[in-house]
Amino acid sequence: MNTAKLRLSLGQVNIGIWLLFSISVLSFKKEIEMSFSGIGSVYIISAFILGSIIIQLPFDIIGAQKLYSHGQKNNKWIRQWFRGIISITTCWSLLSFLIFLLQPKLGFCLPVLITIILVISFQKKLTIFVNADKYNYCDLQNFKGQSISLNCSERTFTGGLFFGFGNNSQIIPDSWSGSSYLEIECFRRSVIVKNKFVTRALFFLIFWNLLGVLIGETQGLYYSDNIGISIVCLSCWMTIWSFFALILMPKFSHSTVYYVDFLSNKYDSDKLKEWIKKFSELIDESDNKNRLVQSIFYPIPSANDRINALKSASSFCFGNISRQNLFLSWGVFNLSCRSVHCNIGRPVLWIFPPSA
């Protein structure tokens, strides 16, 4: 079995554990409240975050040290992992503080919205911080906007477009600087910017996550006299809600990839076809022939499917929502935000998972 299939299996097990954990916590909420009623909220949240890090650690180690891609381990993994953990812990601590501050009068949606906006605003700084290596600004052909070249030791890092309202800045691996395919990839990203797919994805994902928070709140899933337990329940419910996103969103992401490919095919068809095949190799995602597996677990369609779909595509697209939600869901305390096969044990990809 190749690395891609092993990583897929690892991700499925990892997601399954967080899903079962979250369902169990919500199912035994009353018993948990009785057991921990005398413990302070700060201690509960601190123990919960620390526990989530410990549970996830074996998966991170296997993903980084055993199931690495292209025959080369990430030699900066430990430093990047610590910085990634610091970043996520800071985000979750901020969300918890805002809930302490605002929830009694304003509910859970406002603290979540503020946290999501801050996560979006700091995406660029977080990427540079977690990567822990050199970067520089550059001008690239076919992309009108700010470009950052990042010297990244994670070989499956592809960068992408930064979140933002009307934003047109991108980040690329420094290893692509001399690539003959950089021009066509920049053209693809320009198509994404021109069609406002980043903005569409941003609005859709904010709506999706706030809808999940609101449903949980109206159903009383978070209610507890101990605000710490309320935050734990919020985290568990949003982990379940994010699982629905993992199952439903890849199909919508496919339509965006097909449409961008369709428009880019008019620019340089031969180069695009070569790049599609090369890109699949770079991100180390096998062309799984099982259609159900493709539609659920792979937001980026197989190289063969992309090439076969170049002549026609739907223009009704939400953007690359599936994997972008992995990063955005930091703002809703999603325990599985770094448990998918594409980013397990790859700290920089916790912020920028591969997308096309």
Predicted feature descriptions by range:
Residues 235-251:
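Hydrophobic alpha-helical transmembrane segments of polytopic membrane proteins
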Residues 224-240:
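Loop-to-helix entry and N-terminal half of a specific, functionally important transmembrane alpha helix
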Residues 1-223, 248-334, 350-356:
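Polar-ligand-bearing catalytic/cofactor-coordination segments
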Residues 340-342:
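Charge-rich, low-complexity intrinsically disordered segments
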